[in-house]
């Protein structure tokens, strides 16, 4: 819901190259303090994140404004790039809207909490399946005689 998106979530044009660097593939020669040389490599990621594909996992570093490889960035209906707001993170994890809201809790902390969460709907489905199997097991065990 765009009415909850404030300017602070939009990525300034000047920062976009830095975001592209963090999200891009790398093969960089590095040198440890002891002089050992090695190559740091990592594959590229989508930038911005696709709105038509399943989301990547939300991790605890999701909050914050600085460019980061793991933070989700989308191009919204305004055409601008932005980070996800806490409400969107809650929805991705299938929590009720504003589940993490409290006047004394920052947006960064709310994002951290969602990064530490499990997707509620999946946990519910697994729990329901376990319950059904345990009940079936109880019924089957009473028919042994």
Spans of features found by a protein language model:
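C-terminal target-recognition/interaction regions appended to catalytic cores
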Residues: 1-145
């Amino acid at each position: 819901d765009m009415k909850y998106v404030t300017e602070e979530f939009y990525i300034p044009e000047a920062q976009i190259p830095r975001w592209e660097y963090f999200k891009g593939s790398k093969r960089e020669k590095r040198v440890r303090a002891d002089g050992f040389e090695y190559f740091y490599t990592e594959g590229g990621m989508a930038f911005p994140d696709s709105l038509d594909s399943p989301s990547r996992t939300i991790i605890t570093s999701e909050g914050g404004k600085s460019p980061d490889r793991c933070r989700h960035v989308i191009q919204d209906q305004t055409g601008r790039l932005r980070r996800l707001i806490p409400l969107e993170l809650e929805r991705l994890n299938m929590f009720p809207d504003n589940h993490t809201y409290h006047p004394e809790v920052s947006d960064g902390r709310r994002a951290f909490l969602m990064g530490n969460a499990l997707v509620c709907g999946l946990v519910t489905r697994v729990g329901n399946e376990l319950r059904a199997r345990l009940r079936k097991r109880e019924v089957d065990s009473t028919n042994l005689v």
